[in-house]
Amino acid sequence: MSDNIFKRTKILATIGPATFSQEKVYQLLEAGVNGIRMNFSHGANEERIEQINWVRTASKQLGKPVAILQDLQGPKIRLGVLKDNMLNVKVGDMLVLDSEITDHDGSFNLPVQYNLAEKMKVDEPLYMFDGKIRTVVREIVSSTAIRVEVQNDGFLMSRKGLNLPDTDFGGDILTQKDINDLEWGASQDFDYVALSFIQKADDIIDLRRRLTDLGSTANIIAKIETKSAVDPENLEEIVKASDGIMVARGDLAVEAGAEIVPVVQRRIIALCRKYCKLVIVATQMMGSMVDNPEPSRAEVSDVANAVIQGADVVMLSDETANGKYPVETVRAMRKTIIYTQEHSEVMLVEKAEMREKTDAILSYTAAQLARRIKARAIIAGTRTGATAINVAAYRPNLPIVCVTEDVKTAQKLALRYASRPYVRPSESNAATKLADELKQEGYFGADPVTVVLVSGHNPEPGKTDNIQVKTLS
């Protein structure tokens, strides 16, 4: 079998200027990428249509389903354009941030792309340049402007992000741009939609209602990057309401403190596994490869740790969007994943109450049976993907070959742990036929080959009720 078949933790790569061609997209997928992230903070829809076509074309050429994720910008607040693109500041400086300013004159009256006066209160912290400059709100100057006091020396740059760790957005995390992007995205049939700066489960419920109204079946990924989202009780409700979680470690470190990120990451992965939710670990996983052809030892350890904790997906951002070595980065990440999964067991997690149901017990039984009889694979027949997802939640140490009649289901399963989706016509013996086909292609290696077949006769999603052990000849 090839490395790509064995890779149980999946790779999600961000497309950008460094990978803006059909050839580069093909190379990313060939190197081991299972899903493409489209960052809606940048770019135009005309470019995105081209990118989507590249992904779908390369997917067909390689014969592997690939997920596409629409990552909404959310209330990402940025400075406007500064004169000379930079401004030096020092402790004690008083800055005015005004959404009405369009042209910066070099003074401490700064343009900002959001009306902070509507949301912020006196004495709340405001972090500028992605956390490099710390300030505190001292005055609400007008209906469009606030005055902040600088807490450390440094400099600001045009269009850099602002973070408001203690500010309550009052449920307004979907901007008008996000709503417009959602409407356009529904016409493109994305597999996943990621929502930024989630603060509570109601944010997800609102997004799901909007997607339903638009006729979209995209799964919702909640990005955890705020202090309020990591409150233990709140976090669990967010996990339960979503289809998956992205541990957005960059903004989370700025908003809540870098020291909490490793523990929060571990907690989120455990919760997602407990509730059968997709979990993506993101941000600077191989950041040094933006400029260097090899990862650092710390980055390799970071990826390996996510694999050991049982993450479904590890994500690349700048590395593949803007880096000098996008394809090499994917190869390095894949190599790390494969070595780690072959030499270290995935950590165990608490089982959720929902797993006391019959279909969940059967999924657990299938995973344990496959392990004990040393099966080469679990073959999961699934219409909606639920059967394969239930099995994957137990993190079996072998491929889950998923056979489905639905292309959309196959694309979503492309990001699920250990899943290898195939699209086949709906037949009662589709799983058996696929197993025989793969055996003839040499997918399972040398004889004897034993597989575990898992399926359900009940038309309801996830109603697994059939397990078979089959020796392929």
What is the meaning of each model-derived region?
Residues 1-473:
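Non-catalytic helical/linker scaffolds that mediate oligomerization, partner binding
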